[in-house]
Structure formats: structure tokens, C-alpha cells
Amino acid sequence: GTRIVSQGDKCNSLIYIISGIVCSTLSAHDNKIVLTETHDTPFVLEPYNLYGMNQNYECSYSMHTNGSTLVIKKNIVNLLMMKYQIIRTNMLNITCSRLQRVVNENRDFITQSIREKIFRVVCALSSTKKSPKHIKVKMEDLADMIGETRLNVSKELNSMKNEGIAKIKRGEIIIDNINDLKCK
């Protein structure tokens, strides 16, 4: 589809996807893992990266279907935030929600099962828990990321496949509902 922004581009505008379906792609760990998600609208591209130490997009975004966007430059966002309390409150809520998500994901740092470790990696890379996850990664690389052997990761992925939680292809994992992956 049509590229909106690329991973690493400067985030100097609020970009609202008003209609259509947008895909995000994140490459991490020296491109050893690539996570693709689809998002329904309305959707705002990484508003938390408009300010702060890292003002670059974490993902690449492209339109999966025809749609429309609204782009508001940062200087206009600044003026709107100075003028309207509701804009300031919304930006504060977005930032706090992002921070709470990161804190909650890292709270239970010690995990026991391989499935929990896979869940943590996928959640850490995901922008939302709502959409299906398409993960391109070699089993050896995933094993290295979670500190497990390739054999143990293979067994767990096959178990997830047999339970209907994940679809496994060579170098690819598809998880339709990330909440199914989480251990109780």
C-alpha cells in the first residue's frame, strides 16, 4: 500500500488515519524480528513520539486499503494545546497510557514459561493487543531473544499451533489474538 511514514522518520506531525485500514511494521533486534499489525480507524500514528527524547517513528506505516488522513504539524499542535484544555488533557492521557503500558509489561520481569517469554516479546514490540500479529523471525533468533534453546521454542510453538493459538510457517508466526497467548 501507500507508505505514510517509515520507521526512523522524524515525528513532526500528528497523523490521524480517519478511514481505511493501516498496517504498521516494526523491525527490531537488527532486523532479526519483524512484526506487522493491521489497525482499524480512527487511528493516530504514535502521538507519544511527537515530544520527548526520541521524536522518531518506531514503525513504518502504510495504507492497506484506500483511506483518508488528517495531518497536523507540530507547531499547530503546540498552539492548540496552549489554547484548549481538552487537547492538553488528551495528550497527557495518551502519554500516561503509554507509560503505564510499559511499566505494567515490565513489572513481572521474571517469567517462568517459554510461552510467557514469547508473550512478553510480542507485547513489547506490539503497538496494540487488539490486532492480529504477523511475526517474521527465525526460531534460533527468537530462542536467543528469550534465553531458551531452539528445541524448547520449537516445542512451545508446536504446542501453541496444536491449541489453535498460533499458525506457524517457516520463519513466520501468526497470532490472531494475543490474549490467547497469555498464561493464566
What are these regions (language model features)?
Residues 1-19:
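Regulatory nucleotide-sensing modules
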Residues 3, 21-26, 44, 68-69:
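Short beta-strand segments in beta-sandwich/barrel cores
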Residues 35-93:
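Cyclic-nucleotide recognition modules
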Residues 123-184:
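Phosphate-/nucleic-acid-contacting segments
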